[in-house]
């Protein structure tokens, strides 16, 4: 992993310890230039199929082996929903129909050698149409999980916000049924 360099003087920068409120600064030790730790946008898709939700098992760090939803980082100039669809396709080979927004959830992502940085996670809900998921990209496995089993799986979720996302999806699915 390469170092993050100061845009002003080109030296490696350092992250400070979190201040009150969890704020982390990224400051150059040489020229004192301050870079802001802006959140990185991420997009994910909650896919429902006959009372089940699609969960993935992470194949890579961070949190390898834990349960996750299809999703990832938004690319430059990419629409949020398009990013969620792209990640779903890359990680499972699946396509879905109409998607509905589930909202935005904040979290942190750990990058080895650099530390934690904030993420802004946009989720969408869609119904499965056809095909079976084929784990690819950074997914080591894929499983259709009964909505009723999600509570006991919560300790295995990759991210703290996943429980809230799946609760919202479950509530919305029941309201639409």
Kindly label every feature range from the protein language model.
Residues 1-2, 117, 132-177:
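Nudix hydrolase/Nudix homology domain
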Residues 2-45:
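Acidic, metal-coordinating catalytic segment for phosphate/diphosphate chemistry
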Residues 7, 14, 54, 75, ...:
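Nucleotide phosphate-binding site architecture
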Residues 8, 27, 54-55, 68, ...:
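Conserved beta-strand segments that form the floor/walls of ligand-binding pockets within enzyme
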Residues 37-39, 66, 114-120, 139:
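A generic structural micro-feature
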Residues 48, 52, 93-132:
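Active-site segment of metal-dependent pyrophosphate-handling enzymes
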Residues 48-90:
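Conserved Nudix-box catalytic region and its N-terminal flanking loop in Nudix hydrolases
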Residues 49, 70-76, 125, 163-164, ...:
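A short Gly-Trp-Pro
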